[in-house]
From Swiss-Prot:
Keywords: DNA-binding, Nucleus, Repeat, Transcription, Transcription regulation
Localization of this protein: Nucleus
GO cellular component, one term: nucleus
PROSITE patterns tied to this protein: B3 (PS50863)
Annotated protein name in UniProt: B3 domain-containing protein REM10
DNA-binding stretch(es), residue numbering of this chain: 11-103, 150-247, 276-372, 460-554
InterPro entries: B3_DNA-bd, DNA-bd_pseudobarrel_sf, REM_fam
GO molecular function, one term: DNA binding
Pfam families documented for this protein: B3
Length: 555
C-alpha cells in the first residue's frame, strides 16, 4: 500500500538522492528554499522526525545546508549512498523525513532498532550521538561474528584463469569496502597475500579481487571445486580476510542461518522509479542519431552537467555516447552513438527499451533491462512511438507545455515542393518521412521535375543497383542505371531501409553529370548493417511519379 505521507497535497515537500559524502551535510533544493524557508532560518535549528523512531533530531541549518546533527540522523536511520530522502514540512522548521531505498521502496526498520531508539531517547540527545559514533567506530575496527563479516568462495577454472574472484556485494557494503583498493588474504597459518580490490562501473557495481587470487590458490593447494570461507578479521586502511576450512556440515549451517537485517527494501513501491525510463526506437531518432531523455530522469539523478554517458546492453557490452543539454529549450538528448547502439543490438523502429542508471559517477552508466508488463502500463498511449511513427508527442512532461510532434523536434512540415531551394539545401540530414504526414496532410502529389514519366516504366532487371560504402561515404549512382530509369535531374529522393522506414535525402549531380545520394546516406547504411567497404543492393520502386530506393540486402 502506498505511503500517504508521500502524497500530501497540503504540506510542501522535497526529495534528495544521497550521493557520496552525504553524511557531512545535505543541501535543500533552491526552489524549495526560496519559496518556503528564505529569511526564516538564519542561525536556527530544524527538527527532523520519522516513522522509524519516536525521537526528534535537531539539525542546524546554515543557509540551504543541513549540517550539525545531520550525521546523527543518517547513522540512526542506516542511510546509504543511493538512498532517497523525502522531506515533508510540518511546521516552520519541522520536517517529517521518509527514507527510500535505491529502488524507491520505503525502507522498513526492524523492531529491535525501534526499541533501541526508545531506550536511547531516555539518555538524552548528546548521549545518543556519542553512543552511535562509538558503535560505528567499533564496527569498523573489530568485525563481529555475524554472517555479514564472512562469505563463502568457490574455486573455479574460470576465476583461476581470469585471476579474479567476485565477492558478495552485501559483504563489501556492510563492511565499508567501497573505497578500499587493496585487501589482504591470510591463510590458516598466518601467511598473507596482498590483492587488488575493485568495483565494476557496470553490472550493478559488483566487487572483485584481482591480480593475486590465482597465486593464493596455488600456494594453498586450492583447486577447482574447493569451497571455503573467508572471515573479515581486520578492517583498517587495508582490510584483512582470513581463510578458514569449511566442512559440508559447516556449509549447511552457514547457509541456513537467518540474516539479521536492520532494514528491508522489499516493501511495496511508494514512489516511481526515478533511476529508470522507457525509450522507443523510432525511424526519426535512428536517422538523427539522437534520443531525447526525460527531464525528470536527468534532474532527479543530477546528470545536468554530464557530457557523456555509457549505454550498456544486457551482456555487459558498452557504448560511450555524447550528451547535450539544449539551454534554450531545456531538452536533454544523446548525440553521436544512439544509432550505433541500436544497430549493434538489433533494435529496430517500434522496439521499447528500458534503461536504468546503475552507475552515477564521472561517466554515468545506463544499462538495458528487460521490459515487464508494469513498464508497458507506464507508457502514455498518446506518446506511443512504436512502428517507427510518432503518433503524438508532447513536451509537457519536460517543460510543462504542449506542442505538436514537429514543434517538439524543431521541424517544419512541407506538404509539397513549393518551398524555396535555399530551404531545401539547409536540411541537415536524411530524415524518415512520417507516413501519416505524407498520406493524411500532404494531399498534393509531390512533383519530381527531374523524372521522365515516359521512361519510368523500366524493365525489372534495370530496377536493381549495387553500391559500395567507402570511407568518403559518397554513394554514386551509375549513369546507365539512372538513364534507363529516366532520372535525369538532381532533386529529392526517398530511401527505404530494412525496417520499411522512409528516409528523404537529396539527389546530387556534379559538373560531369554523375549523380550521388546526399547527406544521411551513411546513417542509412548503418541502420541497414552495412559496414565500411561492404556492398549492398537497392531496388528502384515507383510510387506514382516518386522514385524510391529500397534496401534489399548486403552482397
Amino acid at each position: 500500500m502506498a505511503n500517504p505521507l508521500l502524497y500530501s497535497p497540503i504540506n510542501p515537500q522535497f526529495f534528495q538522492p544521497l550521493l557520496p559524502g552525504f553524511t557531512n551535510h545535505l543541501d535543500i533544493p533552491v526552489a524549495f528554499f526560496l519559496k518556503y524557508l528564505v529569511g526564516t532560518n538564519v542561525g536556527k535549528t530544524a527538527e527532523l522526525r520519522s516513522d522509524a523512531s519516536e525521537m526528534t533530531w535537531k539539525v542546524k541549518i546554515d543557509g540551504r545546508r543541513l549540517s550539525n546533527g545531520w550525521e546523527d540522523f543518517t547513522i540512526a536511520h542506516d542511510l546509504r549512498v543511493g538512498d532517497i530522502v523525502v522531506f515533508r514540512q510540518e511546521g516552520e522548521l519541522v520536517f517529517h523525513v521518509t527514507a527510500l531505498g535505491p529502488s524507491c521502496c520505503e525502507i522498513q526498520y526492524g523492531e529491535d532498532t525501534l526499541e533501541e531508539d526508545k531506550i536511547e531517547k531516555l539518555c538524552g540527545t548528546e548521549n545518543v550521538s556519542s553512543k552511535k559514533k562509538s558503535l560505528k567506530r567499533e564496527a569498523e575496527s573489530a568485525p563481529d561474528n555475524s554472517l555479514d563479516s564472512c562469505f563463502v568462495a568457490t574455486v573455479t577454472g574460470s576465476n583461476l584463469k581470469r585471476d579474479t574472484l567476485y565477492i558478495p556485494k552485501e559483504f563489501a557494503l556492510s563492511n565499508g569496502l567501497m573505497n578500499k583498493y587493496q585487501i589482504v588474504l591470510m591463510n590458516e597459518e598466518g601467511e598473507s597475500w596482498k590483492i587488488d580490490l575493485r568495483r565494476e562501473a557496470y553490472n550493478y557495481g559488483r566487487f572483485y579481487m584481482r591480480r593475486g587470487w590465482r597465486s593464493f590458490c596455488i600456494a594453498n593447494g586450492k583447486k577447482p571445486g574447493d569451497v571455503f570461507a573467508f572471515k573479515l578479521v581486520k578492517n583498517e586502511e587495508t582490510p584483512m580476510i582470513q581463510l578458514f576450512p569449511m566442512t559440508i556440515e559447516d556449509l549447511d549451517k552457514l547457509q541456513s542461518l537467518p540474516r539479521h537485517k536492520i532494514r528491508k527494501t522489499e516493501a511495496a513501491p511508494s514512489s516511481p522509479d526515478l533511476s529508470s525510463f522507457v525509450a522507443t526506437v523510432t525511424a526519426s531518432n535512428l536517422s538523427r542519431d539522437r534520443l531525447y531523455l526525460p527531464k525528470t530522469f536527468i534532474m532527479s539523478n543530477g546528470l545536468l552537467k554530464k557530457f557523456q554517458m555509457c549505454l550498456m546492453n544486457e551482456e555487459g557490452e558498452s557504448w560511450t555516447i555524447d550528451v547535450k543539454h539544449e539551454a534554450h529549450t531545456g531538452r536533454f538528448l544523446t548525440i553521436r552513438g544512439w544509432r550505433r547502439f541500436c544497430v549493434a543490438n538489433g533494435k529496430k523502429p517500434g522496439d521499447l527499451l528500458k534503461f536504468k542508471l546503475v552507475h552515477n559517477e564521472e561517466t554515468p552508466v545506463l544499462q538495458l533491462l528487460p521490459l515487464n508488463s508494469e513498464d508497458l502500463h507506464k507508457l502514455n498511449p498518446s506518446n506511443d512511438t512504436r512502428h517507427g511513427q510518432s503518433l503524438k508527442v508532447t513536451k509537457k512532461e519536460f517543460l510543462g507545455m504542449e506542442a505538436t510532434e514537429n514543434e517538439f523536434l524543431g521541424e517544419e512540415v512541407y506538404c509539397n515542393d513549393s518551398f524555396k531551394a535555399s530551404e531545401k539545401d539547409t536540411l541537415p540530414f536524411a530524415e524518415p518521412i512520417n507516413e501519416d504526414i505524407r498520406q493524411g496532410q500532404c494531399s498534393q502529389t509531390i512533383k519530381q521535375e527531374y523524372v521522365s514519366t515516359e521512361e519510368k516504366n523500366s524493365t525489372s532487371q534495370n530496377r536493381f543497383v549495387t553500391l559500395t560504402l567507402t570511407h568518403s561515404s559518397k554513394l554514386n549512382l551509375p549513369f546507365e542505371f539512372m538513364k534507363r530509369n529516366g532520372i535525369k535531374k538532381a532533386g529529392k529522393i526517398t530511401m527505404v531501409d530494412r525496417y520499411d522506414a522512409k528516409w528523404r535525402t537529396s539527389l546530387l549531380m556534379d559538373k560531369i553529370g554523375t549523380m550521388s545520394l546526399g547527406r544521411g546516406s551513411k546513417g542509412f547504411c548503418e541502420v541497414n548493417g552495412v559496414e565500411m567497404n561492404e556492398s549492398f543492393i537497392l531496388e528502384l520502386i515507383w510510387e506514382d511519379t516518386v522514385p524510391l530506393l529500397k534496401f534489399c540486402s548486403k552482397v
